[in-house]
């Protein structure tokens, strides 16, 4: 937990003009300071973004360290310009760019005894116009503050400053280490152990540790070795290892240890072919995600990253993209759970100038280069790329040289066109000859995208072997809890992202639709008749997993008619035998029909992956509607006997009520105010609403009535509908 309380002064807006306390990391707006601005302010004539400045103070003691040790101060992210001072002295140059890790060597600025004073002056709007163009004229909320963690590191005078580890699927490991200080005569020792079991790997020569002499100060040392019995990392079996790097001085003493999680995997891009992971063509089922929380804005936590990654996996997705480098703990979750990631330099539509972009690319790539989940680099979004800097990604990713994309563009052999039509273009997508992967499609606003129409587009694109997958827009609703409006959740009208889950990660309709359509286990259309023998066709849409490694269960359910209000009863359950199918194959699954099968109403099937997680479930009627109704008609009559209903209109509200259910309408509008089932409120309100037509409610001609069997509210309208009759029995 990096959260600490700092002193804070805000220049404008809420709680401005006075020193107060603030939690760091945080976005200061969510802590009750400054002003809120949505990034599309420029669409409003004369509107300007909020531009307050925040001043932070924090007092700390110099950490225990050796005589020649160095002390570094790290910031994981500050919005937007950060001027850092220690004991009144500048720590270094002002940092510009909100989404990037930066650091200062502050050894010479610290006191040997007593408290040190850390001061950070943060400008919400950058003094660099290109930074504002890339980050702050954007379709998202504009926050300010030290919103990611701050920490100190103590390192020896001779130390590992940065290292690149390239672990390949064949067990080879290439490494490059950049040293600080005079490393001549020092030795670097590398060992690898399993993350789960802790067992050490051995090289082909049987060694558990590989040693390498180091070069002099400021130079990089590289070495290569090969390890045996390696389990590869992929999206369905994300095997991770821990690489341990020990720096030994001239006497053989260990003076520094660094550990990094790695995955042995090989990522390749081939024009007019596809993206390959460990030699297998990859189809990404992805989504765009911003770092967002209702209570923290752009400040999140490892727990929230885990929650989001698990929700994304639950939708049977395997890939994520965002418009800037995410919190590193989200990449850690992607590494652990098997999600591949497009790591993007920010640039909504505007771009960084060449000098600024070059610095930020280095900061981004050096932080993220060792994550196995990162498969592509992205230079900006929808025109926000500076092509002068394209080559720098491979400069800092010198071993893997991951492919660089320009999202929205057809660039360097990979067409990432956004929001394509079903029949997109001449010589593009299914009509084209290039690898295509829309980095935004199925816009989920108002649930008109997301899962809606996904099957039509996906099935069409899958007919082309150069289809590499795509990324739905967007993961969650981004509505922060406004500290200046009594805690209301604000999406800036219809501007803020509208996702497949709510702002607090509530699952919406598209969540389940996507989960079903992207399930790696698919059941072919199934109609249960009197000749059904328990067999049906299944397809394996995994990329690596054989279906024999999964499980499937069945349940036979007896379902009372909904008016009875009873839950379904399980008449029988058991295991389904799945065939051994390689990815892309279809075959027959089967189970033995239980004796009670004909007594059931619904067959439920549920599939589980190799780790026991539910992939998807399906329900199929054992009998169709008319036979079902005839069977339960007697139960309905019995269930309704003695039921009392009422209807009343008090001028303000119209209430239909039975023993178990009550529905309240607004007498002035005819819209539902609330629905109660027993003491439980059902979230069905503020309707009905006419779509595509006009309906004017007519209270004077509307009426309520009741008799011994039913309570009725007849709502009359002018326009597209004459009336809507609500009947409670």
Language model region names:
Residues 111-115, 178-270, 597, 604, ...:
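Extended acidic/polar, glycine-enriched regions
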Residues 1-40, 121-130, 195-197, 201, ...:
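Accessory carbohydrate-binding/adhesion or oligomerization-edge regions at the termini
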Residues 10-13, 27, 31, 51-160, ...:
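Accessory beta-strand-rich segments of carbohydrate-active enzymes
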Residues 31-62, 66-75, 79-86, 92-93, ...:
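Active-site-adjacent substrate/metal-binding segments within catalytic domains
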Residues 4-41, 617, 651-727:
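Acidic-aromatic substrate-binding/catalytic surfaces of carbohydrate-active enzymes
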Residues 6-14, 23, 29-31, 78, ...:
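Substrate-binding clefts and catalytic carboxylate motifs of secreted carbohydrate-active enzymes
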Residues 86, 172-210, 533-577, 589-590, ...:
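Beta-strand-rich binding/interaction modules
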Residues 303, 309-312, 319-505, 509, ...:
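Substrate-binding/catalytic cleft of secreted carbohydrate-active enzymes
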């Amino acid at each position: 937990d990096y959260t600490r309380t700092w002193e804070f002064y805000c220049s404008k807006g809420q709680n401005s003009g006075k020193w107060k306390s603030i939690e760091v990391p945080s976005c200061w707006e969510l802590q009750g300071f400054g002003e809120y601005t949505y990034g599309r302010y420029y669409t409003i004539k004369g509107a300007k973004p909020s531009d307050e400045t925040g001043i932070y103070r924090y007092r700390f003691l110099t950490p225990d360290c050796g005589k020649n040790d160095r002390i570094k101060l790290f910031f994981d992210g500050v919005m937007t310009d950060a001027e850092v001072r220690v004991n009144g002295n500048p720590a270094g140059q002002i940092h510009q760019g909100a989404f990037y890790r930066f650091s200062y060597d502050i050894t010479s600025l610290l006191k040997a005894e007593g408290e040190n004073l850390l001061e950070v002056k943060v400008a919400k709007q950058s003094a660099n116009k290109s930074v504002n163009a890339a980050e702050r004229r954007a379709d998202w909320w504009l926050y300010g503050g030290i919103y990611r963690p701050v920490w100190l590191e103590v390192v020896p005078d001779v130390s590992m400053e940065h290292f690149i580890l390239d672990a390949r699927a064949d067990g080879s490991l290439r490494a490059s280490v950049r040293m600080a200080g005079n490393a001549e005569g020092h030795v670097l020792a590398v060992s690898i152990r399993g993350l789960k079991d802790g067992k050490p790997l051995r090289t082909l020569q049987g060694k558990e540790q590989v040693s390498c002499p180091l070069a002099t100060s400021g130079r990089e040392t590289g070495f290569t070795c090969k390890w045996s019995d390696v389990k590869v990392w992929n999206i369905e079996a994300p095997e991770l290892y821990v690489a341990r790097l020990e720096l030994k001085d001239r006497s053989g003493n260990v003076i520094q240890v660094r550990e990094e999680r790695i995955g042995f995997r090989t990522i390749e891009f081939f024009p007019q072919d596809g993206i390959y992971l460990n030699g297998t063509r990859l189809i990404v089922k992805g989504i765009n995600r911003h770092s967002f929380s209702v209570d923290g804005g752009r400040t999140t936590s490892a727990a929230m990253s885990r929650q989001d990654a698990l929700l994304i996996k639950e939708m049977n997705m395997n890939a994520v993209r965002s418009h800037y480098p995410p919190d590193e703990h989200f990449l850690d979750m992607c590494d652990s759970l098997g999600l591949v990631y497009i790591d993007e330099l920010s640039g909504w539509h505007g771009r960084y100038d060449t000098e600024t972009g070059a610095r930020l690319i280095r900061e981004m790539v050096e932080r993220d280069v060792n994550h196995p989940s990162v498969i592509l680099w992205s230079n900006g979004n929808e025109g926000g790329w500076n092509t002068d800097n394209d080559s720098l990604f491979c400069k800092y990713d010198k071993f893997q040289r991951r492919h660089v994309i320009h999202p929205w563009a057809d660039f360097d052999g990979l067409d990432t066109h956004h929001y394509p039509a079903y029949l997109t273009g001449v010589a593009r997508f299914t009509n084209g000859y290039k690898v295509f992967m829309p980095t935004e499609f199925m816009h989920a606003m108002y649930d008109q995208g997301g899962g809606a129409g996904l099957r039509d587009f996906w099935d069409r694109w899958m007919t082309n072997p150069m289809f590499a997958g795509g990324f739905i827009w967007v993961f969650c609703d981004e509505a922060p809890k406004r500290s200046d409006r009594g805690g209301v959740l604000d999406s800036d009208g219809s501007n803020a992202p509208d996702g497949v889950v709510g702002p607090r990660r509530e699952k919406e309709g598209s969540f389940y639709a996507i989960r079903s359509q992207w399930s790696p286990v698919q059941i072919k259309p199934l109609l249960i008749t009197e000749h059904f023998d328990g067999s049906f066709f299944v397809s394996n849409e995994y990329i690596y997993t054989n279906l024999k490694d999964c499980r499937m269960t069945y349940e036979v359910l007896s379902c009372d008619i909904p008016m009875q209000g009873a839950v379904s009863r399980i008449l029988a359950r058991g295991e389904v035998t799945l065939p051994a199918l390689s990815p892309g194959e279809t075959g027959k699954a089967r189970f033995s029909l239980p004796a009670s099968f004909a007594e059931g109403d619904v067959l439920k099937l549920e599939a589980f992956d190799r780790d026991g997680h539910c992939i998807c479930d399906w329900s199929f009627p054992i009998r169709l509607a008319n036979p079902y109704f005839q069977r339960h008609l007697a139960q309905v009559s019995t269930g309704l006997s003695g039921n009392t209903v009422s209807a009343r209109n008090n001028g303000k509200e119209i209430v239909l009520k039975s023993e178990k259910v009550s529905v309240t309408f607004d007498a002035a509008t005819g819209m539902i105010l609330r629905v109660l089932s027993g003491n439980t409120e059902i979230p069905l309100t503020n309707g009905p609403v006419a779509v595509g037509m006009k309906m004017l409610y007519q209270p004077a001609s509307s009426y309520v009535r009741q008799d011994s069997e039913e309570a009725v509210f007849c709502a009359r309208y002018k326009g597209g509908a004459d009336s809507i009759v609500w009947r409670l029995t």
